[in-house]
């Protein structure tokens, strides 16, 4: 008898992408499979059953796919956090460090109201830089992060520790060792 596939079984690993020595964890194979995608969304929702969540915030770009599906299931709004210059209207921005240099993400300044309970989602937690910047944006608007949810955690890169040091609750469906 075959065992039931786990979320991790649906994720493809691509060697040496985007650079030599990197094992790229490709969630597009998970998204493309209806059963795999359903399992992932259901498992991402499970820890928050009965908990108040007012909006889901998704980090660009795969966090939009997950965040939209999760917000739909929760019957709440979805808010994107995007790279600088991609949102129309008035925004606030937050810079964060990359391996080589810096980047900036933005959110509409009216997307979250003070006191709203927010679930932050993305596909992968690596160093935690993008998620930490997203958390800061939400908090600057007065939102309260209920939790941060990811499909994949790369524990060797320390992102979970970064977010937990900010007082965040962190959930990931699976973890992969290495880079």
Curated annotation (Swiss-Prot):
Keywords: Cytoplasm, Glycosyltransferase, Purine salvage, Transferase. Its EC number is 2.4.2.7. It catalyses: AMP + diphosphate = 5-phospho-alpha-D-ribose 1-diphosphate + adenine. GO terms for cellular component: cytoplasm. The keyword Glycosyltransferase applies. Pathway: Purine metabolism; AMP biosynthesis via salvage pathway; AMP from adenine: step 1/1. GO terms for molecular function: adenine binding; adenine phosphoribosyltransferase activity; AMP binding. It comes from the Bacteria. Its main location: cytoplasm. It is an enzyme of class 2 (transferase). GO terms for biological process: adenine salvage; AMP salvage; purine ribonucleoside salvage. It is found in: Cytoplasm. Gene3D superfamilies: 3.40.50.2020. Homodimer. Catalyzes a salvage reaction resulting in the formation of AMP, that is energically less costly than de novo synthesis. Belongs to the purine/pyrimidine phosphoribosyltransferase family. This is Adenine phosphoribosyltransferase. It comes from Ruegeria pomeroyi (strain ATCC 700808 / DSM 15171 / DSS-3) (Silicibacter pomeroyi). The lineage of its organism: Bacteria, Pseudomonadati, Pseudomonadota, Alphaproteobacteria, Rhodobacterales. The gene is apt.
């Amino acid at each position: 008898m075959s065992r039931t596939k786990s979320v991790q079984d649906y994720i493809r690993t691509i060697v040496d992408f985007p650079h030599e020595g990197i094992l790229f964890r490709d969630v597009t194979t998970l998204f493309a499979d209806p059963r795999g995608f359903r399992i992932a969304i259901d498992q991402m929702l499970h820890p928050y059953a009965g908990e108040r969540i007012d909006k889901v915030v998704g980090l660009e770009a795969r966090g939009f796919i997950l965040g939209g599906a999760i917000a739909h299931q929760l019957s709440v709004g979805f808010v994107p956090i995007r790279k600088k210059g991609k949102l129309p209207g008035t925004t606030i921005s937050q810079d964060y460090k990359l391996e080589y240099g810096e980047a900036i993400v933005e959110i509409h300044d009216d997307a979250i109201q003070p006191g709203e309970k927010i679930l932050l989602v993305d596909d992968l937690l690596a160093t935690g830089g993008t998620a930490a910047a997203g958390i800061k944006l939400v908090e600057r608007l007065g939102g309260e992060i209920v939790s941060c949810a990811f499909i994949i955690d790369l524990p060797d890169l320390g992102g979970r520790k970064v977010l937990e040091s900010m007082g965040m609750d962190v959930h990931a469906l699976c973890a992969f060792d290495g880079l």
